[in-house]
Amino acid sequence: MPMILQGDCLEIMKTLPDKSVDLFLCDLPYGCLGSQNNNARLMRMENGVATGKKAQTENGLLQGCAWDIKIDLNAFWEQVERLMKDEHTPIIHFCNTRFGFELIKSKENWFRYDLIWNKSKGVGFLLANKMPMRSHENIYVFSKKGANYYRKDITGDFKSSYNQRSQGQNVYGNIPMPEIMPDNTGKRCVKSVIDMSSTTRKGNHPTQKPDDLYAFLIERYSKEGDTILDPTAGSFASVFTAERLNRKGIGIEMNEEFFKKAQDKSA
């Protein structure tokens, strides 16, 4: 059974045993919506049309977005360093460019490389006349030393890159060559751009990632039996996916509504 916990992640992480986590899957609040400065740039929608008025706020926060408050990254890394199994434990962060910059600056010597999640749908239609719609999200991989990685190739019937007769040429002139027909069955290495449809379902957390995306990362950055921690678990999709893949999932969420939904699901 997954371990489903409610509360401030920085406080609950303090209660977990040292060197107990094999993989951190983190989707920390970016701070894009939950601030009064950002609210000033957001417009209230009426019947799908921007009114030009500020969105309604409560205590300086956009309604429904009180969860989007940045956590103390220094305190976060302090707990990560205590909890990680060893110096090769991967710490994976979903982020946009602005928040990703803050993540790197907070632990620059631990940053290893980035991945891109290429979504099926773009967002930001209201700004489509000013900038391209956003259809990707960054995934940053951190570790104290080289992050553990367990290669898992993709399989399928891959499209041929070419299929034609070729003419070889040397000092003796053109020489007929046999038809080139590469074998496109079998396995291929994964690339740094992950093409995967986004999912939007009523009742899910606003930033929930697809189960298949979590599975992609979990299978490549952990082994069966490992412990996976999601410190801001939202709908706990990462935790349930970890359990399905024979890992031990631990999720922490402050919001009572999402916490109770996860409890009901795990019962």
Residues of each region from the PLM?
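Core catalytic lobe of class I
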Residues: 1-259, 267
